[in-house]
Regions:
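Selective transmembrane helix interface/packing segments
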Residues: 2-346
């Protein structure tokens, strides 16, 4: 059953999908709060604890309690801090994450069998744009560390820089491998071109390299050497309290959701559904985005679960893993992608 729509609505579809995409971007901020709750509940299950259970049903209102706590905490600034950097660095980090959001599609709808991605904007080089915006978050971390005038913060920033330099290389090579298979740097085209044959089946090594490098890029355990509590108190964010801490903390969780989106888009087929679903009047509007968000949730829960299942690596082990293992594997995957692309006629 193909749904027919009035002709005068057809020219408005790009604007409608842009507005829907913008509203979903706003929903991601709520999703970041949900990710905090999921992490607490999942970690509690792994450790045989209850987790949040007192404030609201299933502890859902614990998020509101945390927000009130951050808003009412005293806003402290170290005596010798660089005020300009210290005050504005969390805003810079949040801005860089938001700039990533506008290029990431959060689903798609099918109308009359035609695919309309839900994105604020669609770029021909959206993959490169997202990579660039992700990389500049390191400047926000250095602004925080230098502006804090704290040795632990600065050591954490140096560790972050060493880790990101090492892992951005295999991460970028893996993304190029996926782009070669598609013949495009547009993330919408990469997701759409997979159909029901996902890239995880065509490039399993690339998926492993991308996922591990993405975990390191986000600074999640076992790659959180920049804020290891046993060595650096809280690392680069040691001196922050109140809403400044909240902004940096929030940016980290939004970055984690974006990473989950990228895994689902590049390797798990995005929003692709069978043709009979796409051509259905109702399912074509709901199923693609719902299927995509379900994949994203599963990836997110995997990332969160890794924190409580794998111990933290030493910084030298992290660097060795990048340059001695992931980099050769990413190059091998690149060669495989080129050969496979030539064979398939990409």
């Amino acid at each position: 059953m193909v749904m027919q729509i009035p002709e005068f609505i057809v020219p408005l579809i790009p604007w409608i999908r842009g507005l829907v995409g913008l509203s979903l971007v706003g929903a991601i901020f709520l999703g970041a709060m949900g990710a905090v709750w999921i992490e607490r509940k999942l970690s509690a299950d792994i450790q045989f604890r209850y987790g949040p259970s007192r404030v609201g049903k299933f502890g859902l209102l614990q998020l509101v309690a945390d927000a009130i706590k951050l808003f009412t905490k005293e806003d402290m600034r170290p005596r010798n801090a660089d005020r300009l950097l210290f005050d504005n660095a969390p805003i810079f980090m949040m801005s860089s994450v938001f700039l990533m959001l506008v290029a990431v599609p959060v689903g798609a709808v099918f109308i009359n069998g035609v695919e309309y991605p839900l994105a604020v904007t669609e770029m021909d080089i959206s993959v490169l744009y997202i990579e660039a915006m992700s990389a500049i978050t390191i400047f926000g971390i250095f602004m925080i560390a230098y502006g804090s005038n704290n040795k632990y913060s600065l050591l954490g920033a140096f560790r972050n820089f060493a880790r990101m330099v090492g892992y951005e290389v295999p991460l970028g090579i893996t993304v190029v491998s996926v782009a070669i298979m598609t013949g495009s740097l547009n993330i919408v085209e990469i997701a759409s071109s997979q159909g029901l044959l996902w890239n995880i089946f065509l490039q399993p090594i690339g998926f492993i390299v991308f996922f591990v490098a993405l975990m390191a890029d986000m600074g999640r355990l076992p790659f959180d050497q920049n804020e290891s509590e046993e060595e650096l108190v809280a690392g680069w964010i040691t001196e922050y309290t109140g809403m400044r801490f909240g902004l940096a903390f929030f940016a980290e969780y939004i970055h984690m959701i974006l990473g989950s989106f990228l895994v689902a888009l590049l390797f798990l087929g995005g929003w692709n559904v069978p043709a009979f679903v796409a051509n259905n009047a109702v399912l074509g509007l709901i199923a693609p985005t719902g299927f995509f968000l379900l994949k994203t949730l599963l990836v997110l829960m995997t990332i969160i679960g890794m924190r409580w299942a794998v111990p933290r690596f030493r910084i030298d082990q992290v660097v060795d893993l990048s340059w001695k293992k992931l980099l050769p594997l990413s190059i091998l995957n690149l060669v495989w992608a080129v050969c496979l692309g030539l064979y398939l006629g990409a």
